[in-house]
């Protein structure tokens, strides 16, 4: 794996309607009670309580994952017991993305990497340091974002930068950073057709 393969677009495009639409889509998906507002409570419920419990995480893995989710969405300004409406949510994402890109450019650990490490440990059932397509399918079935096997396989292909047939946490981090923060063209179709 060359460092060039892991280079990512570091300039955000916050005014791009597609970037805004991508985040609006997820805002609506994460709005568990469909009231037009989300809170850290909903984020943790959706990301940890539902997904992680469905994957059979150990108590230690679940705690690590929950801590990572709290830190990540806390970085976007989310708080327990405080409902956030769309305009505040997207502004929080802009702040989060800007800070994360600064960290990434300095080879510092990002919040998305910490979340990726925690999630990777749970998905990697055989603990061989890589995620197989079957392990990825089990994860995507539980998270509810990707509904079709075609989208699941497309996501796997986009993340498999080195074309090894397995995913490592560096590949996953790089692709998610590019997809959610900067709309890096190399990350398009990260969720197949499930997320714009």
Swiss-Prot record:
The keyword RNA-binding does not apply. Ca(2+) 3 binds at residues 160, 162, 164, 166, 171. One of its GO terms (biological process) is bioluminescence. Coiled coil: none annotated. Residues 1-7 form a propeptide. CDD domains: EFh (cd00051). Residues 18-53, 54-108, 111-146, 147-182 form the EF-hand domain. Aequorin is used as an intracellular Ca(2+) indicator. Aequorin has a number of advantages over other Ca(2+) indicators, for example, low leakage rate from cells, lack of intracellular compartmentalization or sequestration and it does not disrupt cell functions or embryo development. Ca(2+) 1 binds at residues 31, 33, 35, 37, 42. Residues 47-57, 62-72, 107-117 are annotated as: May interact with the chromophore. SMART domains: EFh. InterPro entries: EF-hand-dom_pair, EF_Hand_1_Ca_BS, EF_hand_dom. Keywords: Calcium, Disulfide bond, Luminescence, Metal-binding, Photoprotein, Repeat. The reduction of the disulfide bond is necessary to regenerate aequorin from apoaequorin. SUPFAM superfamilies: EF-hand. Ca(2+) 2 binds at residues 124, 126, 128, 135. GO terms for molecular function: calcium ion binding. Belongs to the aequorin family. Ca(2+)-dependent bioluminescence photoprotein. Displays an emission peak at 470 nm (blue light). Trace amounts of calcium ion trigger the intramolecular oxidation of the chromophore, coelenterazine into coelenteramide and CO(2) with the concomitant emission of light. This is Aequorin-1. It comes from Aequorea victoria.
